[in-house]
Amino acid sequence: MSKWNRKIWAAILVVGMTASLTACGGSKGENSNASAAGTQNETATVQDESTDSNTDSTGSTTSLVQDNRVLQIPDDNYRTYYELFVYSFYDSDGDGIGDLQGVLEKLDYLNDGDDTTDMDLGINGIWLMPVMPSVTYHKYDTTDYENIDPQYGTLETFQELLTACHDRGIRVILDLAMNHSSSSHPWFQQAAEYLKSLPEGAEPDSSECPYVDYYHFSREYQGGYAQLDGTAWYYEARFWDGMPDLNLENEAVRREFEQIADFWLDM
């Protein structure tokens, strides 16, 4: 039993004993009255101490009435992240599609930057689902890895949002789809055009078109492959034919993504 509970029960028992002595001890005269009065004083003292403070096992005393301590958030990677799909979060311009300006306008709902308030969610991290240019609503089929989809806004708006988040102690994670690109990405488009231009039976040469090695092409159909329109070639596309898988074993592809990562991390 905690010290707080012991004090409450002690107070209840003392009050009960005092009431019994008062009811039964009327004939005992002044001594009984003095005893009861002394007991009542002790009860009041115990109740006052129990109401004002509580002492823990370390000997420190904390208020049970009001706690004015400010929330202390450790500076580590264990945070409360809010996964945010911009498309459906908040539309700031009335076009029916959520945007980065909408996220900026509703940032106080997520975290108002004041640890003493309790009207916000109090998150300290945002995981932004893909925000880069794409031909679909979900934006996982990227057409440009170093820009913002026009439906969502501009790089300037993103930078403004990033600054506002950092001012509130919010960290931002970008969902960067590196496993595949869009079939509309210039890399894939150039590789496709090159393959279409090859004479029948000719093998592709990466020195003529380096992007042909950015993806997995094959003359034979395999599971998870889609046919390249207008050719006898197939390409790996595990999700769907609009998202061709990238060849991450290719050093050139890895260097591309090192540069892309630096672009966003340097903002």
Q: Which residue ranges define each predicted feature?
A:
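Acidic/aromatic-lined carbohydrate-recognition and catalytic surfaces
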Residues: 25-26, 62-258
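Bacterial N-terminal signal peptides that target proteins for export
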Residues: 2-12
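Hydrophobic helical h-region of N-terminal Sec-dependent signal peptides
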Residues: 13-18
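C-terminal motif of bacterial Sec signal peptides marking the signal peptidase cleavage site
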Residues: 20-23
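Short, low-complexity, disordered segments immediately C-terminal to signal peptides
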Residues: 25-54, 58
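Short, intrinsically disordered, charge-balanced linker/junction segments flanking boundaries
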Residues: 55-58, 252, 259-267
